[in-house]
Amino acid sequence: MKGVYHLAKLEWYFEYEIQVNRPGLLGDISSLLGMLSINIVTINGVDLSRRGMLLRCRHIDQIKRLESILKTMETIKVTKLREPRLRDRLAVRHGRYIQRDADDKKTFRFERDELGLLVDFMAELFKKEGHKLIGIRGMPRVGKTESIVASSVCASKRWLFVSSTLLKQTIRSQLIADEYSTENVFIVDGIVSTRRGSERHLQLVREIMRLPATKVVEHPDIFVQNTEYTLDDFDYIIELRNDPDEVITYEHAEEPQMFDQSGFSSFDF
């Protein structure tokens, strides 16, 4: 185990912004890394003028020497040189960086054409053990529920709808014994639970919230308006839009008969 831990500490994320885009620039940087015996694990562009690399080396001194040499280069500007975070690994893997709210660091923004990146991001969160409360905002039919299910599959987790409108309106009021497994991903539709759920259903939601497992709440703003929970209880908030200028509103949730009018039928297990 010591060897594995040691190797993990010697992975680094290196990202730079191109100042002078000339032929052979990437080759020069690769040669520099080679001379310092630093291996390139993965490389990708993460923006029009930025490139990211996942590096691996044996000693911290190699990174210190690299850093000092990079400071003398006028053709690039180092933007990140650090132990890799989840967002760094995904940036290299997908070729784009996950947008993060400048004021609220636990809020991450995605667009519909980034569903692959979103699924990968959530799958990595789902793999982590213990309690996690994730909220996901977005307009109807933008792909919220489908992304949660796909992420569960990628993380080899079983997903369980506590409340949902994916196919037909589902409102659970009890679970069977094995459904309480902390290996499950529990999916709650904040609008369905608070607008249509019985007291038995809401009690079940409270039980699930206490489990050391992953819970994903769609429409978290409506959920916290009508329960004892607050947005501070959420570990991550994800926003999914059709386009960057789309405003996420809840006007569609104001009609009390909205699901009946849409042709949904309700199940209570």
From Swiss-Prot:
Instruction: State the PROSITE patterns in the record.
Output: ACT
Tell me which InterPro entries the record gives: ACT-like_dom_sf (IPR045865), ACT_dom (IPR002912), DUF3388 (IPR024514), UCP021288_ACT (IPR016784)
Q: Could you tell me which residue ranges the ACT domain spans?
A: 14-89
Q: Which residues form the signal peptide?
A: none
Q: Which residues pair up as cystines?
A: none
Q: Name one Pfam family in it.
A: DUF3388
The protein's name in its UniProt record: Uncharacterized protein YmfK
Species this chain originates from: Bacillus subtilis (strain 168)
Q: Which gene encodes it?
A: ymfK
